[in-house]
């Protein structure tokens, strides 16, 4: 998205092979735009050769104006990365997190410059999906917030301001939607039936295909993080965790609820993904499948 908007981009990966794979994925996405006539060959060449730098060295970020962190959804990992960014990036550089759920205030507190820290949460795939959540932490400076919205406009996104809360806006809504789908699976439906019904109704994708696209490890990390405070009567499916425990995180690993051939975004149902689904919680809830209304959420997510 940033390349298409005319920005120079520095991409940091952990290892050389991962860096080259990332470059290949970006080139693949841009080649699609080239084939559709959205960009010229000259622009494609400039974006993939001149405007894009791929590195495994954080020092490559020393002169950038804004960094968007998009590492694994784990607070310890996030803090480690922000510590490195804090040490390397120039004074005044904005440090943004693409976190889906985590506390941006806590991330900001791990740096010496909390006023420069903000959440910029994109939705998958980031070069297509329009929504951008601009998550304002307690100490985020007003000019940093303004820059977040300016970036969203430059990227042709619909930017919304969000407060610091679990899942912000989009994922709080999605969580209730996904809970309903999980309860249907516990009651005997398959993920593939649910996805098909929603696509037939007019949705671009069903919730399980969306999970594969975003990465099943994100939801897995969230479920583990919330386990200690979960109500004992809550109906919690175990089949998504079993998929993740097998190392299957969706499109990024080639297998999740669906199986994906190399280079393909379309998958075929993975029957083994639900072979061990559990109905152990069927009798544990007397709610009859009713879900808490979104309006009943106590903590505000808008500012």
Task: Show the residue positions of the predicted features.
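N-terminal glycine-rich phosphate-binding loop for ADP-containing cofactors
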Residues: 1-303
């Amino acid at each position: 998205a940033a390349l298409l908007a005319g920005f120079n981009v520095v991409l940091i990966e952990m290892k050389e092979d991962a860096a080259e794979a990332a470059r290949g994925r970006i080139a693949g996405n841009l080649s699609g735009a080239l084939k559709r006539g959205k960009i010229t060959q000259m622009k494609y060449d400039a974006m993939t050769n001149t405007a894009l730098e791929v590195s495994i060295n954080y020092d490559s970020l020393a002169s950038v104006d804004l960094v968007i962190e998009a590492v694994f959804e784990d607070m310890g990992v996030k803090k480690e990365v922000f510590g490195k960014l804090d040490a390397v990036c120039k004074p005044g550089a904005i440090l943004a997190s693409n976190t889906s759920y985590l506390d941006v205030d806590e991330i900001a507190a791990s740096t010496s410059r909390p006023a420069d820290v903000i959440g910029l949460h994109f939705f998958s795939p980031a070069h297509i999906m329009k929504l951008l959540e601009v998550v304002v932490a307690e100490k985020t400076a007003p000019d940093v917030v303004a820059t977040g919205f300016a970036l969203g406009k430059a990227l042709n996104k619909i930017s919304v301001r969000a407060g610091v809360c679990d899942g912000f806006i989009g994922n709080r809504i999605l969580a209730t939607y996904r809970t309903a789908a999980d309860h249907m699976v516990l009651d005997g439906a398959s993920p593939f039936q649910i996805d098909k019904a929603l696509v037939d109704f007019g949705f671009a994708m069903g919730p399980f295909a969306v999970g594969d696209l975003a990465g099943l490890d994100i939801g897995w990390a969230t479920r583990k993080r919330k386990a200690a405070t979960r109500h004992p009567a809550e109906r919690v499916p175990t089949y998504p965790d079993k998929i993740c425990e097998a190392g299957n995180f969706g499109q990024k690993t080639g297998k999740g609820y669906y199986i994906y051939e190399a280079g393909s975004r379309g998958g075929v149902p993975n029957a083994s993904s639900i072979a061990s689904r559990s109905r152990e919680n069927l009798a544990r809830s007397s709610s009859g499948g009713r879900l808490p209304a979104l309006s009943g959420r106590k903590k505000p997510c808008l500012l």
